[in-house]
């Protein structure tokens, strides 16, 4: 949300920080609430693009039901914000600790999230792209 003293980059950073914190802390209502309803998602771990936040949440619920999937924590590094008019691009490296019935695992990925300024001044995420991070 904009304030008289904030810049768009600060607002985008705040939106990104809130989204990442909600994800890391397992606050799913806050996490999914960070996305516009018609946000799209491209994940290296899924065969198709997800066409809405509801579709992504349904997939997440399936992971929980089938594998007892949960986030144990995540760390965001190498953050970059590009302010482009009414949109902002947030990219970063993310290290996520997850747990499933198979045990715990740490995954290393790169993520790009596109935010768009809404009429109320907030910056909901409208697209997320997650890629595996290579070591090379």
Model-derived features: positions:
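A solvent-exposed, acidic/Ser-Thr-rich amphipathic alpha-helical stretch
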Residues: 8-11, 15, 28-86, 93, ...
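A short, polar/proline- and glycine-enriched secondary-structure boundary/capping micro-motif
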Residues: 100-103, 135-136
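Generic short beta-strand segments
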Residues: 91-98
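Short beta-strand edge/turn micro-motifs at domain boundaries
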Residues: 108-136
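Basic/polar N-terminal segments that are highly enriched at the extreme N-terminus
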Residues: 1-10, 136
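Short helix-adjacent coil turns
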Residues: 19, 26-27
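Hydrophobic alpha-helical segments of small multi-pass membrane proteins
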Residues: 79, 96, 110-114
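A short, structured loop/turn motif at beta-sheet edges
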Residues: 81-88, 103, 115-124
